Amino acid sequence: MLNILNKKIIMPSAKIFGENYTVEVVYKKISNPELNLCGKIIMVYLPTKYKRTGDTGILRLALEKMYDEIARIEIENVMEETRIMLNGLAPENYVIKRIPNKLAKTLANKTIVINPEIVKYDKEILRYVILHEFCHLKYKNHTKKFWEMIEKYMPYYEQYELVA
């Protein structure tokens, strides 16, 4: 539900790494949406033409682009940390792409696909999901050896299994 206050629309919240952020929308004379993160507030500046049309889809798109950018940076960092931790085990490629009902998956060609929506969850879930997918590079199925490998590098993984 959106609440209108003067020139701002305040959404209840958006999540970044499990933390709630207030979203404030300000309509300005600009041609493209802009976002700024100020403490626990995500300021979204939208062109005034969207205020007249009442189009809130542009807000959703702006937030998706924000998640995409955060995901690009953070996933790359965690992928590199995981590669080092696993002594060079790495996918052939990885792709950041929205996939329904999943945070990530490993394809037969050893490409890992990661949903950018993962940045809404705690950062440890990102680490767990990436470790999980890296382990699929060595063990295709959830065998005993697969789970032993995960446990070796993340002994407390079970607390993230239900979320991921």
Task: Give the residues covered by each predicted segment.
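Active-site-proximal or metal-binding-adjacent scaffold patches in catalytic folds
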Residues: M1-R127, L137-A164
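Walker B catalytic acidic pair
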Residues: E133
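Walker B beta-strand of ABC/ABC-like P-loop ATPase nucleotide-binding domains
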Residues: I130
